[in-house]
């Protein structure tokens, strides 16, 4: 279950031992959350901001601009990563931390520890597009953006964002690297896809606005990403440099519109992507390192007054012959306020500090960024209360209300792409044999396992998996099983697939799916269910019935089974054009 008792006996013992620290962060000291938009936050004078900025050394100012990453897992006080991060926080060489995978109790403990050793409060962040559980076990899991858009209900998006904010603040996290406002115009996009609200500009703006409001009205900084738009590329920037080919008119008409809307709404942070925009910059320089994109376009022309943050600096899109030191200096020169996730945060700090001290980067450039960072920390109330009360975790994390919202999003998102032969809901004997074929684009025994187990509770079930390494004997066995089946379900969790870029499926897998209708007895129901991208369903028109749930979480799986049994009518609306092209 997603919602569960998150405090084990061991965790409770840890909390008891930490009680002297927790008393400093009691509920009586809860800071009322402000709701001022970015347009006012970053313009007004503030004595705490001025005084803090005035007493920081050059080294400490540069440190404010660096956000280092750490796993949110229990660490002893001799753990190398723990010791390093503690020292960097103590010495003022980092201004924030980004949590990777872990659990809610450990995250809260680590956040409190690093805050306690840092003179200036730390800005703690995480990528929580699908909720806090995307990073931390014990929290509520939500469906991705495309599922939320398919539900067609911005109020659900706002409710989800409010829950994410409440859970995040409970463990000491202040900034969410969401929403993704990229228009997923290209079906072959390998990195955005279901992370996007779709390819329809009004829908993307509406859903993004709900997420921004839900986060920021509940005390968490929202971040629009990946400027100037990562939706029409065919390369994953984690591995290589994508190129956005559009000219300025094209970007104004499409990619830039959701960012303009978010800025007008008062979003507090924008993340710049690692992608080239040659028709704007005249080079293949990544946008995140381009003054033309970061300062001239985003800061000056768009008038954005909030925090500008790089995408993670460990991504291979940046590492084509560039050193980390060069990347960090270039990112600051471009106009970024925060350098996210440098592999060597101390090396990044040293490089930027040296660039300031030798005059390559003006100190005024650093001061501008640090002032904005401190203004955000002031808005968050971190100058008054920077520790969290872990004894209250169960009051805020994985509540019944959160579970109900997550389940409703999943149910409302299920989209019937087509049902040419009207096979849904199933009209077969409950004990009739159903064959569930799990279509993987990589080896693995876990993908689709939980759905098969749950399906087997309602039907007599045979399940098997086909991946690119499957031998011919496996395909022959699968074909034989389908011939006597009462119904066949093809399930997949593939995140990126289109007619033009057929993911990593083998030719044998593709041909098997295409030939499947001719293998079975006439009238045998065949349903293709995607727990990931909807584009794969268009790539196999031979299958007459297709459902998209957009997500592999347990609520989505439950909803699909309810559709098959006639207990749920699928009412989701497809948020993208399956044929691609401009919306």
Question: For each predicted feature, which ranges?
Answer:
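Short glycine-enriched loops at secondary-structure junctions
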Residues: 71-74, 126-134, 174-184, 224-230, ...
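Short acidic, glycine-rich surface-loop motifs adjacent to enzyme active sites
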Residues: 63-65, 85-104, 187-188, 263-285, ...
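Second-shell residues forming the walls of enzyme active-site clefts
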Residues: 54-57, 97, 105-122, 132-134, ...
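Preference for extracellular/luminal or secreted protein segments
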Residues: 26-88, 300, 322-583
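Bacterial N-terminal signal peptides that target proteins for export
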Residues: 1-11
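Loop/turn elements at helix/coil->beta-strand transitions in domains of secreted/extracellular proteins
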Residues: 61-65, 92-96, 118-122, 169-175, ...
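Bacterial N-terminal signal peptides
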Residues: 10-20
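Active-site mouth loops of central-metabolism enzymes
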Residues: 68-80, 146-157, 240-254, 315-322
